[in-house]
Amino acid sequence: MKELLGKQALVTGTTGIGRAIAMRLAAGGAQVVACGIDTIANAELARAAADLHLAVEVEACDVTDLEGMRSVVRTTVSRFGGLDIIVNAAAIHPFGNAVETDLETWNRCMMVNVGSIFILAHLGIPEMKKRGGGSIINLASVQGYACQRGVVAYAASKGAIHSLTRALALDHAPDNIRVNSISPGSIATPMLARSAAHFSPDEDVAQVFSRFGAAHPLGRIGTPEEVAELAAFLASDKAGFCTGGDYLVDGGLLAGLAVQ
C-alpha cells in the first residue's frame, strides 16, 4: 500500500536504520532524499534503491554543517516540490566514561546526534509549514532510559533526543507538525557490530549478537526493517494524533528487570 504517496522525505544516515527507513518510505510511495557522510554507504544505498526502482536520491553531507544541510533541504524542495517528512537517523557511538572521553569527542557526539536534529528543525520546519504540516521522526535509543557502562556521551545524547523531541512537538503542534522519537533496543546494524567488537573483542560478532538478543524478552535482536515499519507509520497520516511520544522497538527489553 502506498500510504506515503505524494510525500517528500529527507532522511539523515545511510547505513543501518537510516538506510532501511529511506527504502521503506520510498516503498510506501514517498520521494526521498537520503544523506550521509559515508561515501561507500551512500553508493550502496543508491544502488539498492535503483535496483528496486525506488525514488531515493542520495546526497553526501555532514549533518553538523549548517550551510551544507541548508543546501540539502533546498535540494529536496527543488527536486520534489516540498518537504513533508524528516527522519533524523544519523548518529555516532563513541565509547568511554567521563574520564576517558575527551571534550572533542563529547562535543562531536552531541553535535551529530542532537545538534543535527536542531539544525534540520531550524531549516526544515519553515518548509513543512508551507505544506500545511509534516512529521519529524528522531532516532533515539533505549540507552536514553537505561544505559550500559562506558557510553557516557552516547547515552547522554540519546536522553537529550527525548527531551528535544517533546520540546519540538509542543512548539510546533499549532503548525500541524508532529514530532516523535523511536527508541530501538539492540538492532542488527554496523553500529551494533562495532559495539560488539568493542565490548567483546575475543568473541565472534554473531555470538555477541546472540548474547545481546538473549537479554531481550523476545529472545533476539531486531532488524532495521522492523524499526523502519514504525517510522513509516509515524510518517503517515495514520499517525495523525501521535506527537511528542517516544516509541520502543526493543523486544521488551525495558519491560523487565536486569536482575534474573
Predicted regions: what is each one?
Residues 3-33:
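Canonical Rossmann dinucleotide-binding motif of NAD(H)/NADP(H)-dependent dehydrogenases/reductases
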Residues 30-44:
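Conserved glycine-rich Rossmann-like NAD(P)H-binding loop of the short-chain dehydrogenase/reductase
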Residues 97-98, 105-107, 208, 212:
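Substrate-binding pocket helix/loop in short-chain dehydrogenase/reductase
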Residues 121, 157, 165:
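Active-site helix of classical SDR
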Residues 126, 170-174, 240:
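Alpha-helical segment proximal to the catalytic Tyr-Lys
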Residues 141:
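Residue(s) in the substrate-gating loop at a strand-loop-helix junction
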Residues 146, 232, 243-260:
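Short C-terminal tail/terminal secondary-structure segment
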